[in-house]
């Protein structure tokens, strides 16, 4: 049985359900671009000496595997298929791979479970890099790098959505924020915990899993980030790798160290980066702050809901006992006037309820000196004791900052 491997397996888990459940006619890829022509040939022209695994990839790359860049990494079934070609990079199955823990994708194709996958991805990555990938898996976001096939599907779906919106409202009014987190609409996986700190179930009104939604600015500019329910939890990863360490599985110790860096519920790469910097142990260069809730809901008082523009909000990093919320604001956070008014109203409402709202932007976090100044000031507000800034610690912290900010999801 062929098994997706490494980054190809990760790409599968990052593929939005809207894409995975679609199928395209390869001819739609002939859009005049070189990339479109290249992928069209891959999907329509059999490889020399094509075996069953390669043929399966060629046919399914227009369906449920279309979110995975080609050539994809695969542990094939037949020994003779261990030759790379235009569609498949063959990999040998990891010795630790437990067939009982593989997930069937139908048609004989398998994919490792998320915990198993991170054992594969541990090789060649640092603990910090692995921890950031785990933060994504345990968070409310996926970074999906579009393939040519996925781009064609999403373009078609976008047109259909716009046509439905026109039919519903009879015009173009009201399209602002039609697909993003920032829009004031029914939420899609934009909180991990309820007001009491209890973990949410991520179910829709009908009891099914909440759908994926593409993150956009309030003016509708698409990004590569999608809102989606978490794939796993930090505790599940820690428990799994603890058992793997006892069994002597290679890379399990590194995976366990990475899993201990993870907080559940990050809603963006910036939140994941900040969490690693501030909550990692001092031995890695972190400040080892007490851990908050990531994306916990706060319900506004009835008289403040008009000001806030909503009934409740999701706080990025919330210490509810201290009534302090740290907000991580990315480049497109205040993309326009409407976005600014929504967020300023939200902050004013939180402060009226006694919360202290602190903010840091991506630009401030990218600059090490600026970030250090801000994080030390945050520690004062929170009453946390920062790690002593010895020369040895500062060296570790600069290296941690370099790894965190250089990492590309």
Label every PLM stretch briefly.
Residues 1-249, 399-409:
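Short gly/ser-rich loop at a beta-strand->alpha-helix junction or flexible surface loop bordering the NTP-binding
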Residues 161-165, 174-409:
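Surface segments flanking catalytic/ligand-binding clefts of nucleic-acid enzymes
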